[in-house]
């Protein structure tokens, strides 16, 4: 058993403006600021653990969405200043939607992100392996994990007699740099098994997703889908 005090608060503001023309077409501009604060104190007496962590993140974000005849194009970025990371993190994103008709649309998206070198919820729980408790600690000099993601999808809708149908096909790929991995560190002085979170070389996650739906008005609907996904390290960890 343990006792955790966890206080989180968030404050921010956002501006949204619609403009008749920005560069080449009508656009919606969005910008904002956000500040997050989290204070954590976790005590687990039975495992001789007393952990304190203060996380403060100041963020700014900007995006602009252009709307043209058959296209919607979005470009934006987010800037995060994290107190546990030396330099601010710049995270851009792009999105392009092509809609040639009311029944068909295609989308492609590229985005970036990161995970800070901090303790997460799963680190506060004692994992049991073979009846033995396992504690997770953070390595000295742990760097943030960065991600690059790209996805594309085709969404098709059609009416067949009295039935409405929809088919969505999506492909996705995410590459991770300085990926977080757990290394076995043996046992601590109290006999607890310890694993250390370190930076690995990299990893990737990719796959396809297919969803289909058929409905008869509001009377009945059937939806099926499946996902094929593969996750792997770029090098043996």
For every predicted segment, state its role.
Residues 7-13, 56-62, 77, 90-96, ...:
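Hydrophobic, lipid-facing positions within transmembrane beta-strands of outer-membrane proteins
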Residues 5-7, 25, 54-56, 88, ...:
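Residue-level preference for beta-strand/loop junctions
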Residues 1-86, 165-171, 221-227:
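Face-selective signature of the C-terminal outer-membrane beta-barrel domain
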Residues 104-157, 179:
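Outer-membrane beta-barrel translocator/channel fold
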Residues 1-2, 41-49, 85-91, 119-125, ...:
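Outer-membrane beta-barrel translocator domains and adjoining extracellular loop/strand segments
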Residues 1, 99, 107, 141-198, ...:
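Membrane-embedded beta-barrel scaffold of Gram-negative outer-membrane proteins
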Residues 17-23, 65-70, 90, 98-102, ...:
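Outer-membrane beta-barrel strand-turn architecture
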Residues 67-72, 166-167, 171-175, 196-237:
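Gram-negative outer-membrane beta-barrel transporters
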